[in-house]
A protein has these predicted regions:
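Membrane-spanning alpha-helical segments of multipass transporters and channels
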Residues: 58, 250, 254, 262-387
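Residues that define the loop-to-transmembrane-helix transition and helix capping
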Residues: 20-21, 230, 296
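Extracytoplasmic/periplasmic domains immediately adjacent to an N-terminal transmembrane anchor
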Residues: 1-186, 374, 378-381, 386-387
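Hydrophobic alpha-helical transmembrane bundles that constitute the permease/transmembrane domains
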Residues: 23, 27, 196, 241-249, ...
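Hydrophobic alpha-helical transmembrane segments of multi-pass membrane transport proteins
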Residues: 32-35, 175-255
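Alpha-helical membrane-protein architecture signal
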Residues: 2, 6-10, 186, 225-226, ...
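Hydrophobic alpha-helical transmembrane segments of integral membrane proteins
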Residues: 26-27, 190, 314, 330
């Protein structure tokens, strides 16, 4: 049996060597994806995003607010405008993401306790930029009122402790668990890169099986395995499994041990998750081809499954907030279970037993070929390829 397995795997290596699709989809594109996403946000968060100022007060207080806003890491004051219309036009031209409006009489209103209003406008076309700039603009607006209050209380002879107690009666002790730096690279690369690698696995698996029919090699392939479909599939996918596993595990080593992404869960769940992710995607590809023994249909199913995974895995929008039918359908995607295991066992370091249902789901995906593998044998021996 092992001799047959070896010869089938060797035959598959020859096929892969002659077909550049394998080289690009299994090595070049995954490496390019890793480099692209890990360097896309290497600084962690966007910095120096352009902001405009409409200062109609021209006072010491307004200038102080502008200087403080410009000092924030994510904000950079790039221009001043005479009125709201000019600033709005700049947002429409994508020259700035937001602008701060300081109306005339702001400083006088603060000193007279008349509660003047300052306004800020921001674009949420880009969700990350909009939310970060909203935070900075809201903070600077709060600081403006606090600065005036501090000046008045200081003039009345209050101590610094008394001033702080008056301005902030309740102190907030804030802790961001898992990712204290709010590093977007930690969120982006750990989901997008594995998802794209899994998409390549989804596509290559039915492609490699379907081309046996397309190029009239199916009978020879089954003859080498002694008409044993399990042996035929195992030998054919063994080289692909080793290559994809190497790419996947090297990616995980790169982000966790070279780039230093947080992984308090340790190495065991990282390695096990990488192995099960590759095997589950290959198994789904085998299942899809056995369900519909057609190169085009099986690849269409797998591409649909891989692309929808990005929306339904819960990384960008929580699955439990979606409608109940969609939440149930989400469990049919390997990437959903990958993401849940990653954020529970690797990112947060919770025990693996907490994600036992998701580990079991990946194992269940690995057993899917049992349902359709005999249909693959029938297709290889009886069916003819129809372009």
């Amino acid at each position: 049996m092992f001799k047959k397995l070896y010869h089938i795997a060797l035959r598959e290596c020859g096929i892969m060597w002659k077909n550049p699709i394998y080289f690009f989809c299994m090595i070049i594109f995954p490496i390019a994806v890793v480099i692209f996403f890990t360097t896309l946000m290497k600084d962690g968060v966007p910095t120096d995003m352009p902001v405009g100022i409409v200062d109609q007060d021209h006072s010491a207080t307004s200038r102080q607010l502008v200087h403080k806003l410009d000092a924030f890491q994510t904000t950079k004051v790039v221009s001043h405008y005479e009125n709201i219309a000019e600033a709005r036009h700049a947002i429409q031209k994508n020259e700035i993401y937001a602008f701060l409006l300081i109306p005339s009489g702001t400083e006088a209103g603060l000193m007279a306790s008349r509660q003047p209003k300052i306004s800020f406008y921001y674009s949420s076309v880009s969700l990350a930029a909009g939310s970060l700039l909203f935070r900075d603009l809201k903070t600077i607006s709060t600081l403006g009122g606090a600065a005036a209050g501090m000046a008045k209380l200081s003039a009345l002879g209050k101590t610094n402790d008394e001033i702080m107690t008056f301005l902030q009666p309740i102190a907030v002790d804030l802790h961001m668990i898992g990712n204290p730096y709010a590093n977007y690279n930690y969120y982006l690369s750990t989901v997008m890169v594995p998802g794209l690698i899994m998409l390549f696995i989804f596509l290559i698996t039915p492609y490699s099986i379907g081309t046996e029919l397309k190029f009239n090699r199916a009978r020879d392939w089954m003859r080498m395995s002694g008409n044993n479909p399990y042996l035929a599939i195992a030998g054919k996918l063994l080289p692909q499994t080793l290559i994809f596993l190497s790419i996947f595990l090297l990616f995980e080593f790169y982000i966790y041990y070279v780039l230093g992404f947080p992984h308090p869960g340790g190495a065991a769940p990282i390695i096990l998750l990488g192995i099960l992710s590759v095997l589950s995607c290959q198994s789904f590809g085998i299942f899809a081809f056995g369900l519909m023994p057609s190169l085009r249909m099986s690849m269409s199913i797998c591409s649909l499954w891989g692309v929808v995974s990005f929306s339904i895995c819960g990384a960008t929008y929580p699955l439990f907030a979606m409608d109940s039918p969609i939440e149930a359908i989400g469990q049919l995607f390997p990437m959903r279970h990958y993401y849940m295991i990653y954020q529970m066992n690797i990112f947060n370091g919770f025990p693996m037993s907490d994600a036992v249902l998701h580990w079991s789901a990946l194992v269940l995906f690995c057993s899917l070929p049992i349902l359709t593998i005999w249909n693959i044998k029938k297709a290889m021996l009886v069916y003819k390829y129809l372009p």
